Amino acid sequence: MSVRVLIRKPTPADCQELLALHHRSQEFHHPWVTPPLNERDCQDYIDRCHQADFEGLLICHVANDRIIGVANFSQIFYRSFQNAYLGYYADVDFAGQGLMSEGVRLAIDYAFGILKLHRIEANIQPENRASIDLVKRLNFTREGFSRRYLKIDGEWRDHERYALTVEDWH
């Protein structure tokens, strides 16, 4: 199988391309995720990617380095927990092509290999079937249901909780 995507850390030079992706995909992302829609918030996101408890990765097309999605690991804990929360989203122009599955797979390899995490958790709204299907393809296990778990777009939303450990990854 040929490699179609790569992952890399965002830089300030990526801000305009990210903003264009976010605006183009805004309706597609609603109500699942609300990425930055202005330059200040985008720069804040890129700055956050340099903090110890957060790792943001761009998923890019190998052919032209175009950003086709984002994978984030937030609230990274070490010591006896070694856990992070995974969030991701795609550019609407590349949805449904399997590129995000490939990119998130690379991001998980990075989290277990480079970040030395033991466990990754993904919390997904039950109506977001595409995202649930993605984590299931990647061998995540459904662990439970969290009522009114996150406030997104001004509303507290239910989520299904999925997790993957390094032992189940390889």
Predicted regions and their residues:
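A short helix-loop-beta-strand connector motif used in the catalytic cores of GNAT acetyltransferases and
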Residues: 47-58
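Conserved GNAT-fold acetyl-CoA-binding loop/helix
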Residues: 27-46
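A generic secondary-structure signal
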Residues: 45-48, 110
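Acyl-donor (CoA/ACP) binding surface of acyl/acetyltransferases
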Residues: 1-17, 21-26, 60-170
